[in-house]
Amino acid sequence: MKQLILALMLLLIGGGIGMTQAQTTGKKVDKKTEKAAKKAAEEAELNAKYALAVKALEQQEFVLEATRVEFKRGRSEYVSSTTNFVSLKDGKATVQLATNSVISGPNGMGGITVEGNASHIESKTDKKGNITYEFQVQGTGISARVSFRMTKGTNRCRATVYPNFNSNMISFDGELYPYAQSNVFKGRTL
């Protein structure tokens, strides 16, 4: 009798564990499919942003909204994307830097805004699909070469400004958008 009760208890416990494992396996499958669907949606969104950025580069009407700025000797600072940007529209290039400082600066926002005519515009795509986009800027307060580097599959971009008369290069890291979709505030230019 005791053996029969013990066998029934083991059978009930074993059956319960088996059902729990089946439910756990079902949850794992659901989580895996959910994770895969989420990853596919994120990848599709990034590819759509990349396609818009490539089209904006081809039309020469774009804005790089920077969230991080890196100075000559590697010092970097996180900044606002609405006040730190590099843009090109109608043959005019604008470079604006506005750090989070107390001093207002020449542009009224804690930095400097320079504008000039863009020339010698070149675009190259390497075998991996990464894009390098360069142009020269000449204007009041700026004489420089600007080089953009955008990785395939994303609109994340890095623009480096190389001045012609000194070595105080500066890099802007952020996302590249078509000019019409950008959300930037332009300060006073020099």
List the predicted regions and their residue ranges.
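N-terminal post-signal-peptidase region of extra-cytosolic proteins
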Residues: 48-50, 66-81
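Bacterial Sec-dependent N-terminal signal peptides
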Residues: 1-28
